[in-house]
């Protein structure tokens, strides 16, 4: 338990806590009070892309459904409005449950002896299209699927916000630079994100763009402004 570890954490050496949550992956089971935060009747369908922005059924998505969603036999948007609302409600509830647990950990960290010497990196592996663009999957670079939380807190670092799309491949080299260590020579992917926060850390190469390649599909999210399909 991460909170119990903070009660006995050694302060004379480096420590690493990797705190992961399955939610909001299926199954979307959490304490009832989090479901009660959301009224299914108040949930509205997201804006569907205009015809010229919707690229239609893709073979890769069919493979994804077959592998992950009941062999392709069921997805919420195929089962009617009420089924979709209940799934989205459960998805939101699962996120709120994670928010609650993260808050518990951060409060415990703030009260611990390592609060001022600890770096916190908060991220998610992917978002999800909950009907956005007439889809119910994650295999795309649309904002609903690719725009995930990525936050870095480090004692003494001035707050800054970065709008540029970046890749999670950058996180390992960011951690190493924060620790004052060189990246491993076999890490050929990614770059440290710290120059985006403070130029004193060096230069960030913004000519590189996040890419997703899975199930025979390829999506590119250019870092340059002006190339964005929301």
What residue ranges belong to the model's regions?
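C-terminal cap/loop subdomain of S1 sulfatases and analogous C-terminal strand-loop tails that border
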Residues: 126-132, 172, 177-230
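Active-site-proximal cap/lid insertion segments
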Residues: 1, 5-117, 121-165, 178-187
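An acidic site on a long C-lobe helix of protein kinase domains
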Residues: 167-171
């Amino acid at each position: 338990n991460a909170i119990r570890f903070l009660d006995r954490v050694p302060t004379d050496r480096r420590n690493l806590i990797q705190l992961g949550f399955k939610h909001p992956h299926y199954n979307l089971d959490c304490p009832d009070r989090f479901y009660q935060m959301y009224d299914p009747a108040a949930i509205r369908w997201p804006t569907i892309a205009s015809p010229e922005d919707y690229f239609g059924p893709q073979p890769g998505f069919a493979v994804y459904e077959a592998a992950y969603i009941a062999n392709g036999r069921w997805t919420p948007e195929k089962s009617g409005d009420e089924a979709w609302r209940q799934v989205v409600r459960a998805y939101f509830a699962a996120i709120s449950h994670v928010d609650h647990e993260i808050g518990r950990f951060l409060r415990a960290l703030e009260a611990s002896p390592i609060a001022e010497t600890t770096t916190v990196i908060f991220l998610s592996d992917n978002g999800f299209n909950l009907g956005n663009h007439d889809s119910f999957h994650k295999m795309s670079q649309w904002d609903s699927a690719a725009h995930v939380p990525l936050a870095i807190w480090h004692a003494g670092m001035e707050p800054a916000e970065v709008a540029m799309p970046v890749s999670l491949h950058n996180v390992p080299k960011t951690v190493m630079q924060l620790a004052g260590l060189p990246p491993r020579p076999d890490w050929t992917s990614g770059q440290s994100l710290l120059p985006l926060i403070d130029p004193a850390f060096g230069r960030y190469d913004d000519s590189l763009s996040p890419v997703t390649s899975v199930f025979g599909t390829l999506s590119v999210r250019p870092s340059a402004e002006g190339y964005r399909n929301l």
